[in-house]
Amino acid sequence: MNSDDNRIASEHTLQGQLKLYYDLELPAAKPAPLLIALHGYGANKRQMMREAKQMAPENFALLSLQGFHQHMKEPKEPGGQWRFGFGWLTNFHPEDSVKIHHQALLDLIGSLTADGTVDRGRIFLLGFSQSCALNYRFAFWQPELLRGVIGICGGIPGDWETSADYKPTQAGVFHLTGTRDEFYSPERVADYEERLRLRAQNVEFKSYDAAHEIVPAMREDVRSWLTKHAA
């Protein structure tokens, strides 16, 4: 008889602590408008902070939160040093990662507004690629919290039409896409503007001559959009 016939297998979970890392840059004048910038898959907080500094007006506080799923990346050159990258979720219990993402944003916003560093009425959330749909989940789950949300070369939640978690918001929405994006092609994102308008009245959708990347024209338009909506 196979000994496995007498065994009972089951899956369990346990609670653990997770340390999240972020970079913060503050202007002299406070309380300041805040841009929270989240990177895409395989990147890190330093890379996204560089992007945020090129997109945000000078009077903005900048926060770059790093994804909590770490992985190794091959060296840039043969024989070189192995690198690290970070992501936000996988298809293994993604709801757990969504909760971590959401709670991290709530904690960061709560801390920075409580001490007067950030203007509670001028908080903006930006995501590139993988973090884009996660940010939309947060923005429409907390419809009164943000002044605006920006998505670059990313998607919208898969349960956008069916979930009761998403509420209408007065926050501005700016979605930027690349006409040569190999992951989010023009065909794939063709109905995004219409779908986002299901729960947001102030939606701007714009395409650029770009692949899966942030190009100078995008940076300029994001800066202008932030200036307008933070006024």
Predicted regions and their residues:
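Active-site signature of alpha/beta-hydrolase-fold catalytic machinery across serine-
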Residues: 50, 137-141
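C-terminal catalytic histidine-bearing segment of alpha/beta-hydrolase fold enzymes
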Residues: 174, 187-231
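Conserved alpha/beta-hydrolase "nucleophile elbow" surrounding the catalytic nucleophile
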Residues: 39-41, 126-128, 178
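Short beta-strand/loop motif that positions the catalytic acidic residue
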Residues: 175-177, 181
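Serine-hydrolase catalytic machinery in alpha/beta-hydrolase-like enzymes
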Residues: 12-118
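Alpha/beta-hydrolase fold nucleophile elbow
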Residues: 117-127
